[in-house]
Amino acid sequence: MSLLASLFGRKTSAPVARDRLQILLAHERSAGEGQSELIAKLQEEILAVITRHITVDQDKVQIKMDRGAGVSMLEIDIEVPELKARAAPQAAAAIK
């Protein structure tokens, strides 16, 4: 499957997500201050995508929006648990 993806130039999810985020932030910047609902929805959707793949403690998520002269930056800090600790019990259960 990776051979087909490399032949047809399929983007991985990270660049696609980055492109979408850049488009949304550009739209929000051009619309002005009245678009706080868009940023709130964007934050919810980003967290929903991340929690589909890893367990996230909601208390350890920090979201910050900075607006400058021509740049808006959405910063999301998430403390990710160690993946090895989660994988070990699952591997042990599979052996039994």
Curated annotation (Swiss-Prot):
One of its GO terms (biological process) is regulation of division septum assembly. The keyword GTP-binding does not apply. It comes from the Bacteria. Keywords: Cell cycle, Cell division. Gene3D superfamilies: Cell division topological specificity factor MinE. SUPFAM superfamilies: Cell division protein MinE topological specificity domain. Belongs to the MinE family. Prevents the cell division inhibition by proteins MinC and MinD at internal division sites while permitting inhibition at polar sites. This ensures cell division at the proper site by restricting the formation of a division septum at the midpoint of the long axis of the cell. NCBIfam families: minE, PRK00296.1. This is Cell division topological specificity factor. It comes from Gluconacetobacter diazotrophicus (strain ATCC 49037 / DSM 5601 / CCUG 37298 / CIP 103539 / LMG 7603 / PAl5). The gene is minE.
